[in-house]
Amino acid sequence: MATSKCYYPRPSHRFFTTDQHVTATSDFELDEWDLFNTGSDSSSSFSFSDLTITSGRTGTNRQIHGGSDSGKAASSLPVNVPDWSKILGDESRRQRKISNEEEVDGDEILCGEGTRRVPPHELLANRRMASFSVHEGAGRTLKGRDLSRVRNTIFKIRGIED
């Protein structure tokens, strides 16, 4: 069955014109400038002739650039971010050095000449194989003799004999 290229159905109703006309579109719609410029002075002079509209090849990427930047204010206050390396001083350096010497991060593996970064998916795959090494095959559980062997082995390791 062939489909037409028109995605919008044709309207089955008609609108008849009336004598009432809207004189100004600004009565019902907000202008973009009203939303973006709420924090600045209303007395700042701006004319729409200062705007330049550039379009890309496809015509969908339209950008509007303002002509003057004099009336713009900062939208957020500056924040003081503490520098913890200066606050803690030598203690943070000492702690970092101790932690680097004692253990390797979870995503690094020791090699002959140093450490090697391991991608996270390989690291998870290695951990999963270690945790599911009792199971053989996808979706298979231990039953009967296999389960009793595993249970008896665990009891022997723990020191509890059945």
Curated annotation (Swiss-Prot):
Q: Does the keyword Cytoplasm apply?
A: yes
The record's section on Pfam families has:
Senescence_reg
- GO biological processes: leaf senescence; response to abscisic acid; response to absence of light; response to bacterium; response to jasmonic acid; response to salicylic acid
Highest taxon above the source species:
Eukaryota
Q: Would you tell me the Gene Ontology cellular component terms?
A: cytoplasm
Q: What induces it?
A: Induced by dark, abscisic acid (ABA) and salicylic acid (SA), and slightly by jasmonic acid (MeJA). Triggered by pathogen attack such as Pseudomonas syringae pv. Tomato DC3000.
Against InterPro entries, the record matches this protein to:
Senescence_reg_S40
* Sorted UniProt keywords: Cytoplasm
Where found in the cell?
Cytoplasm
As for family, the record states:
Belongs to the senescence regulator S40 family.
**Name of the featured protein:** Protein S40-4
Q: Which organism is it from?
A: Arabidopsis thaliana (Mouse-ear cress)
Name of the coding gene = S40-4
